[in-house]
Amino acid sequence: MKKILVILFITLFIPNHLLAKDPKSSHPTFTKWLLDNGYNQYVDIDAKGVPRHNLKLKVSERLWKIPYKKNPNRDTLIYYFYRYNFSHLTGDPNTYSWKPIEIKPAKEPYKFEFDLQEDKFVKKQVKTKGILSYLYFQDGKILIDEISPKEKLGEFVNDETRLISMSMGKSVMSYILGHAICEGYIDNIDSTIDDWPVLETSLYNNQKLIDMLNMAPGDQKVIYEWGDGAGIKADNDYDYQVNNIYTTIGFYFQNTEKSKSVYNYNGLITMILHNYIRHKTGDNYKVFLNKIFQNKVKNKHNVQFVEMNSGSEEWGIGHSMVRLTRHDWLRLAKAMMDDYQNNTCVGKYLKKIHERRIPKNLHGKMQAGGNKKYVEPEFNRTKSYGGQFHFDYPGLKNRIVFGLAGRGGNAILIDVENSRIVVINSIQYNNTKYKYNVKKLLLDPIKNGR
């Protein structure tokens, strides 16, 4: 009781600047977040009366994200859960910081029907891997709905917790671009990006949208993003994730020329596409986003996009990361499926990017440096890519399945022909401890249904 009262006093009355004097390794802003959200069991008070978390953390000093090969303990997963989903809102100086753009809930959110079935294998995978949430939707109903148990990360995750997209945001941006085309802001996927001054003198100027959407603008000599790689070849320390497009282009892409069009997956392309949408929609951008989510997706909770904390709009300050609640991720996937099935204008866009997909051609290809082969994580190891979606999954020959995938094992598979959707939100995935069963959790439900 005494500890609780002391912590309550500190939470209410200790100013932030006293916490901020703590060493970086103690993560004082994270400690304050724990206190502010009632996770007092993870905080102790030291001899000087300063609150410190009591978790045993192993945090990468080099990367913002969990290194792919690492097998973090539960304590470290708690920290990264905070880092991925909340730290950008706390002013934490030790992590990425973005300004949120909030999309309010729809007036009449889509209501799911449930016919829940118990699947012991899914339960075991959610309990033992890095999975935060698992949803399976078929023929208009949710059949499986599992969330991380309390002893894993369940005390931090509920139906109102917004979960980070990671690279699933690439596909979200493509879906938004489809709406921009259908509302007349952009002509079509063969339109040329030749009207945005930010890209002038760079290889991205005069590119066709379809080449950008397919991750094939011929930028592989300048940017390389694979595994835990930094991205910009000329400067491994530069992070485009926290810089506007104008700055990145000015530093590293001036007078660059397009190389051969081959699949070269990287997040900068998506950030350029996102900011091009902002450029074309102008002052209508936020109204445009609200219309998509409130009228089409029919989200139940706030959806959060982000942008840089500083810089002018014309510099390209938008980021492609997005955060939705677990069921709103399913609502978004269902909206995509409905568009495809109903052959709406956006549905025709989705069909077109599927038709225009390109082979990844990664088999046997060597990474930069020539000492390792390209190997994508199994959950997005597909044969082709198109319009910022993964296509042609193993074992699903001749099936039209749209795949969204993001670091940590985040994955959504949408079988647009058979009305099946799998949504996995996950914090870590690798080839050892945190490797979930891709075949049984993702591919088999899409292939066979239930």
What spans do the regions from the language model cover?
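Active-site-proximal alpha-helical segments within enzyme catalytic domains
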Residues: 269-276, 320-345, 410-427
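Catalytic-site signature segments of enzymes, centered on catalytic residues
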Residues: 159-160, 224-320
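Active-site-proximal loop and beta-strand segments within enzyme catalytic domains
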Residues: 123-124, 155-160, 164-165, 169, ...
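Active-site Gly/Thr loop motif
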Residues: 299-301, 356-421
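Active-site SXXK
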Residues: 140, 161-188, 212, 273-277, ...
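N-terminal leader/targeting segments and the immediately adjacent pre-domain N-terminus
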Residues: 20-155, 186, 214, 440-450
